[in-house]
């Protein structure tokens, strides 16, 4: 029984969060996952406030590009397409993410770039991945 629980644990989905400050202009961030990561499952972007506390942001003003091992997976798209709304929560199940499945090797280069057309914003990016396929 312990062996089957070990396999189930290793195959389970995991998440890692990144807090990114996006001043006006372009911000690039490396998303470093565990060296055991074998499958990128997807991501979700969330942000409720600008760098000025209690000020709601408009995610439409953010553009996002996601690159996984030189493969541009999201190319200059509205961050709103990958975001949880600032109010009202979400109706999805758990885990809730935008699927962007990609194989990983454990020595991957994953980067996300935001282009911000307005005031500085704090953005949370949650990446979902698996250690085994």
Question: Model-derived features: where do they sit?
Answer:
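Beta-strand-centric surfaces of beta-sandwich/beta-rich domains
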Residues: 1-133
């Amino acid at each position: 029984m312990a062996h089957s629980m070990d396999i189930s644990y290793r195959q389970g989905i995991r998440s890692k969060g990144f807090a990114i400050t996006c001043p006006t202009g372009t911000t690039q961030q490396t998303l470093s996952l565990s060296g055991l990561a074998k499958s990128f499952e997807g991501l979700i972007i969330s942000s409720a406030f600008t760098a000025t506390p209690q000020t709601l942001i408009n995610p439409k003003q953010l553009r996002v590009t996601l690159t996984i091992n030189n493969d541009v997976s999201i190319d200059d798209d509205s961050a709103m397409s990958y975001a949880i709304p600032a109010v009202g929560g979400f109706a999805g199940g758990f885990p809730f993410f935008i699927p962007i499945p990609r194989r990983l090797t454990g020595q991957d280069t994953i980067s996300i770039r935001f282009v911000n057309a307005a005031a500085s914003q704090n953005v949370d990016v949650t990446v979902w991945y698996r250690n085994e396929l």
